[in-house]
Every structure is written in structure tokens, then in C-alpha cells.
Amino acid sequence: MSQQQQFKYIVRLFGQDVDGTMKVPYALAMVKGIGYNTARAIVFKLGLDKDRRLGELSDEDIKKIENYLTDKKILEVPNWMYNRRKDYESGIDMHLVTSDLIFYVRNDIEREKKIKSWRGVRHSLGLKVRGQRTRTTGRTGVTVGVRRSKAAQAAQQQQKAQASSGGEKKQG
């Protein structure tokens, strides 16, 4: 009879606690930098069962998953699956997870601010960066409503004046 493994409800994966009751691809997708498609590719390349729960995996399988991404490469997958293609400094394709991804993104934003590119200026001003509309959305602070044109304001004041003078009854 084989040794019965105990089910792990919380699994430590890439320095992050992941729910062990989830199926392996969905649990891997909970890690920052790994989406569902990337998780499926990892599970397929490692030969794991995609229908098993993460808590059912042995410690060796979990180590195998972590070691698969330690060199920042996913072996035998197309380049378009990487989340950092053609790195600015090294020029190589990488796949980053957790704190590495956060670090690289923060450095990219700081570099853009330093060279004062359009994106860097937008980041430093706290405005939208990717060309979204800013006239009506993304307002911060106490700005509420829309400013009316002078013609519309004059027409509204005239209507108020007519309503107030015409609505009063004269007593005599």
C-alpha cells in the first residue's frame, strides 16, 4: 500500500499563498505574472494532470513548477507567451513572476519619467497613459459636473427670471 499524502489547503508557490482546493491551472493563474494560458502551458510541459487539485500535488511537483520559471524562461513555448519580450537592457525574452515583474515595471516607468517621454510625463502627472478619454472620466478631487457655456448659462438664467416673475400673484 502506498503512502497516503495529506491534502494541503494552502500551498506556498512563488512566495505566495495559493488555495490548494483549486485545480492546478487555475491555482497557478493566481500568481502575479502567470495567466491561465501560461499556466496551462506549464502544466502541459511538466506532464501534470490539469484536473488535479493543487493541494494533491507532491512537494516534488511543486518544486518542479517553481524551478520551471526560475530562469525566467518557459521552455518550448512561442515567444508571444512571454510577459516581457525583448527586454530594454538585455534584449532577451523573459517571463517574470511576482516581485520580479513588479520591479521591472516600476523601473520601466521610472526610466520613462527620467527621459521625459510622453508616457513618462503622463505617469508623473497622474494622468491616463494609453490614450484614453480624459474629458469626462478619471476625474479626481472635488470636480463634479460639467461646466456650461455662457450662452447656455444666460438662457437658463432667463428662464429662471421668467418663471419667478410670471408665477407670482399680485395682491391688491
Curated annotation (Swiss-Prot):
Gene Ontology molecular function: rRNA binding; structural constituent of ribosome
GO biological process, one term: translation
GO CC terms of this entry: cytosol; small ribosomal subunit
Low complexity bias spans: 134-163
Chain intervals for the UniProt region annotation (Disordered): 131-172
Superkingdom assignment: Archaea
Keywords: Ribonucleoprotein, Ribosomal protein, RNA-binding, rRNA-binding
Function, in words: Located at the top of the head of the 30S subunit, it contacts several helices of the 16S rRNA. In the 70S ribosome it contacts the 23S rRNA (bridge B1a) and protein L5 of the 50S subunit (bridge B1b), connecting the 2 subunits; these bridges are implicated in subunit movement.
Subunit (UniProt): Part of the 30S ribosomal subunit. Forms a loose heterodimer with protein S19. Forms two bridges to the 50S subunit in the 70S ribosome.
UniProt protein name: Small ribosomal subunit protein uS13
Organism: Sulfurisphaera tokodaii (strain DSM 16993 / JCM 10545 / NBRC 100140 / 7) (Sulfolobus tokodaii)
